[in-house]
Amino acid sequence: MASATVDFGIGRILSVLENETLLLSGVHGEIDKMKKELLIMKSFLEDTHKHGGNGSTTTTTQLFQTFVANTRDLAYQIEDILDEFGYHIHGYRSCAKIWRAFHFPRYMWARHSIAQKLGMVNVMIQSISDSMKRYYHSENYQAALLPPIDDGDAKWVNNISESSLFFSENSLVGIDAPKGKLIGRLLSPEPQRIVVAVVGMGGSGKTTLSANIFKSQSVRRHFESYAWVTISKSYVIEDVFRTMIKEFYKEADTQIPAELYSLGYRELVEKLVEYLQSKRYIVVLDDVWTTGLWREISIALPDGIYGSRVMMTTRDMNVASFPYGIGSTKHEIELLKEDEAWVLFSNKAFPASLEQCRTQNLEPIARKLVERCQGLPLAIASLGSMMSTKKFESEWKKVYSTLNWELNNNHELKIVRSIMFLSFNDLPYPLKRCFLYCSLFPVNYRMKRKRLIRMWMAQRFVEPIRGVKAEEVADSYLNELVYRNMLQVILWNPFGRPKAFKMHDVIWEIALSVSKLERFCDVYNDDSDGDDAAETMENYGSRHLCIQKEMTPDSIRATNLHSLLVCSSAKHKMELLPSLNLLRALDLEDSSISKLPDCLVTMFNLKYLNLSKTQVKELPKNFHKLVNLETLNTKHSKIEELPLGMWKLKKLRYLITFRRNEGHDSNWNYVLGTRVVPKIWQLKDLQVMDCFNAEDELIKNLGCMTQLTRISLVMVRREHGRDLCDSLNKIKRIRFLSLTSIDEEEPLEIDDLIATASIEKLFLAGKLERVPSWFNTLQNLTYLGLRGSQLQENAILSIQTLPRLVWLSFYNAYMGPRLRFAQGFQNLKILEIVQMKHLTEVVIEDGAMFELQKLYVRACRGLEYVPRGIENLINLQELHLIHVSNQLVERIRGEGSVDRSRVKHIPAIKHYFRTDNGSFYVSLSS
């Protein structure tokens, strides 16, 4: 993991030195000297590692690690110096001009002090650089250097890849179904060359599965020529061609050309084309990292009429999804199910007999170990092999309690570690930081997309790209980590976008170990041992900390934290906050904290504050001093009003104050807004405003906040209509708009709204006297929710042709007896029909809503039978009937009922009902 280590040292410093505040403030002379020397050091360290710093000798390894550790510590010092400088600059510039002369001496003193500190850092950098050069030229060091070699992890993994061709049967679990599917694709009758990509995270069994297929008799009989080529991460295309030629000739039992190693690129291509031109061949390219390989190699693999196939394994979804040609496809590897994982582990841990497991009472702890592997075949097999030598329950329990240590130190688990490090080292530097930051969260924690993105932005992990919003860049980072199988998507929203992620247990263990080694992240949990944990935090200075158990005032003594997360419901005291002046992100979501200390406002660098789902009732009075704050999330907290002076937080981008009214006794006031503070409309950079009471000043000036993309207002009154529409028409980037009237009889006057082209999600709660004329202009709309509209006319005609509509929710939206869906709604996947008290019939014409997957019918008591035409919805997966009439339910209950044949194609049908004993549901599926 040398590249990662260099990145976290010198790479971090170079990134920090791009800070624009510094460059604008007249101290860039020291910076230029730093950057030049650091670039030389970076090249030296990378070259040293390449020639022997990867573990070839103890001397080179220790020197390498020492130099990098020193530069990493300097990086942290520079970050702190810059933050301190930013504090002084802001204090000076924010003064009224009349007071600047008074504060000028203090500002100049601060600037001089910072320049001195940077000068001292420069001296330290020069000292480290001189030490490197001195040791590099020493005789002992030169003797220790070896000729250039490939990365140790990569070489080890390549050997394992080759050995997969000689798999043992007890390693093959859970492959029958995917094997049959893939062989069927390889043997398909299409004459053109087809590429089949097998994609999955490192250690998921891609290579084992592919090797089993490659060696199968059906494949051997079908193809004339075969080649298995393991692709080095730093491959040379000529070497790939030579390996391929050797494989083809060896499989054909033919003499390998004597001149092979003297041939150049063109001759190698010609020889391959000549050999394969009239043959049906299969090539397996194992462990492909980039699409660039295909661009280079495809010219040598003839696309003839004989049905040749290319199979490749990759960890990267971008590689698997590349357009390789007509008929090409990808197969995503699924992790092993619980029973399959147990079989594989048992085969390795108890090769003689499972009886040993039972007689020695090992099964409970063994199953816990298997559970930690979360279906990852490589981890299961490696751990099973290691445990096969351990006979006593105490030994097994020790391994379970120290699994993180075992992964990083036990030689028998080296392959697991090496494969994961290969994926990690391949990440660009910004993605390395973002990935390791995810190890802050507890194992199996559900990490939400927006939360991650905003925390990354607060830490300045997101590299600026001209013309692209930081949110979009961060989103691309997240997608890239998913494509590379470093994060797993565990929740998608109905619109096909990832909503929540998790990190595989094994990857999390390794990521956390790297984070601790790099003094980047640390966790304070049940594995932390009181004084030792405190000493670790104080002495090693990790920048980001997650507290996962109850903390005492003296349990954390670090002062240089940039992130503090509390992921525990235990009681916490905030005595440590006064010492955390460098904090950039404070996340207390779902913690037991009920009061914030006044010292919070001294955290000048704070950019992200998450108080959602806490018991906090108010923010400090001087909250406006947090001038760098970008995100404030008080969702589902007890905060009803923001403090005065909020308008001074000019950098604020996300203001999220949505609250549920837990004690409401009606179907209307279930959402509570936050009371608006004066001048809040002066927050010109605000992008998210969710959710606020509609008050006259805000409504009239809302149009000043032209960067808003998400707006949620409650307590809207009829007289707001014209001003509200005028303001909204000035905002051209709205993607989410939610308007709720003050009560269910108060009309929403929104006919004059015209700036609707950008809206993707629209929720209107309030009486509509007519269908807005602009409904049919919502060409980008994916969600439409109408609640309490009480329309006398059918709105369906105005929205049925909207091309991107995925989710439609009607809640007491229509007063007529008949709801008819004609041709249209071609992309609709979710339909909700709720509380239509006059509704007696729903008709779905043939061809309408062809893609519908979920249908909810709730509290429509007048509806006595399922929608006519429901039998035509062949993609419908779920039908939910909630508090509907007994007549409707009985018509589809059980075989032989009147309408049973119309719903028999639906996999899941559920009926929800209430009795005096509570709420229940039953399945009506066949």
Swiss-Prot record:
Residue windows of the LRR repeats: 561-580, 581-603, 605-625, 626-649, 686-707, 708-731, 756-777, 778-804, 825-836, 837-859, 876-900
Effect of residue 924 to F: Loss of function
Result of altering residue 620 to S/L: Loss of function
Impact upon substituting residue 778 to F: Loss of function
Organism listed in the record: Arabidopsis thaliana (Mouse-ear cress)
Topology versus the membrane: Peripheral membrane protein
InterPro entries: Apaf_helical, Disease_R_plants, LRR_dom_sf, LRR_R13L4/SHOC2-like, NB-ARC, P-loop_NTPase, RX-like_CC, Rx_N
Outcome (variant: residue 290 to I): Loss of function
Gene field: RPM1
Record-listed ATP binding positions: 200-207
Entry protein name: Disease resistance protein RPM1
Cellular location(s): Endomembrane system; Cell membrane
Impact reported for residue 301 to F: In rps3-2; loss of function
Phenotypic consequence of residue 313 to I: Loss of function
Domain comment (free text): The LRR repeats probably act as specificity determinant of pathogen recognition.
CDD domains membership: RX-CC_like
